[in-house]
């Protein structure tokens, strides 16, 4: 519901501790409501025991940022082990795990489940619930910023000024609204679907030519 007022911020390999300094000062901006380090808009894939799930990263601010509730266990913290992960209810059900907290997943290394999150819709357009695994990642250069209602243009200007003050390079900061990125993703999905349908018809046509040729 907040995707139209959530900005995704990204910079290509900022120098030294510039990004950490930048994100640490975001809440000084009055128009900024909250922020979190997350790559929720560029999800990967996780596979174990022949079962696939979406994979993303998040930090200790991830759950409160999206207003998510823990069903079991605990959320991330700065003292969380490097292999700590959160999973959603759909993941637990799909994997048929009886006691998910402190359960160890083995796939490209080990992952320790520290908590279970309620199912939530990642993509507001498709509204689909999928098995999800969230890795602890507090150092991502992808940051989501929630802007107060009616303050988007002012907030963007102040964010750009803050980045320029810290890095000296205003152009190096990239940002999109979460809603806009969802729309781009779905347009790409529609293009792929149209191509699949087109090639299916071509295949049927060529098959028919072979039968009657």
Language model features with spans:
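Membrane-proximal extracellular/periplasmic loop immediately following the first transmembrane helix
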Residues: 1-57
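Membrane-proximal juxtamembrane linkers immediately C-terminal to transmembrane helices
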Residues: 1-9, 69, 127-128, 138
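A short, compositionally biased
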Residues: 42, 97-102, 138-139
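Conserved beta-strand termini and adjacent loop/short-helix elements that scaffold enzyme active sites
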Residues: 37-40, 73, 175-178
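"Rare, low-scoring activations can occur
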Residues: 17-34, 89-93, 108-193
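Short, contiguous acidic/charged loop-to-helix segments that flank catalytic cores in large enzymes
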Residues: 9-14, 50-51, 75-82, 131-137, ...
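Hydrophobic alpha-helical transmembrane segments of multi-pass inner-membrane transport and secretion
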Residues: 190-213
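Hydrophobic secondary-structure segments that place a key small or acidic residue at a functional site
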Residues: 52-130
